Amino acid sequence: MAKQKIRIRLKAYDHRLLDASAKKIVEAVKMTNAKVSGPIPLPTERTLYTVLTSPHKYKDAREQFEKLVHKRLIEIIDPTPKTIDSLMKVDLPAGVDVEIKL
């Protein structure tokens, strides 16, 4: 018999917000006596943008901006209906993107 697993993938620009959200989810799942693996830090996605500071010439004068997307993975092994209900009730901040795979 295969074990059922729920994978929760969190993404955010701010790692402190992401870690606080992951902690809330883990606490909610542990209250229902389900096994939790994580939060597992995944590689940070880094996007670099290079822009000319001058509108016409001076190609040597450039400015660089970077966007970091931090990610975490939480696995819930053998969830119960009570676990799923507690996950639905967890209040997460607006800056965190959540993907759930069953």
Curated annotation (Swiss-Prot):
Instruction: Name the cystine pairs.
Output: none
Q: What PROSITE patterns is this protein classified in?
A: RIBOSOMAL_S10
List, alphabetically, the Pfam families matched: Ribosomal_S10
Q: What does this protein do?
A: Involved in the binding of tRNA to the ribosomes.
Report the protein name in the record: Small ribosomal subunit protein uS10
Q: Is the keyword Chloroplast assigned to this protein?
A: no
Question: Which terms are listed as keywords in the entry?
Answer: Ribonucleoprotein, Ribosomal protein
Identify the coding gene: rpsJ
Q: Which GO terms describe its cellular component?
A: ribonucleoprotein complex; ribosome
Q: Which family does it belong to?
A: Belongs to the universal ribosomal protein uS10 family.
Q: Which InterPro entries match?
A: Ribosomal_uS10, Ribosomal_uS10_CS, Ribosomal_uS10_dom, Ribosomal_uS10_dom_sf
Highest taxon of the lineage: Bacteria
GO molecular function terms attached to this record: structural constituent of ribosome; tRNA binding
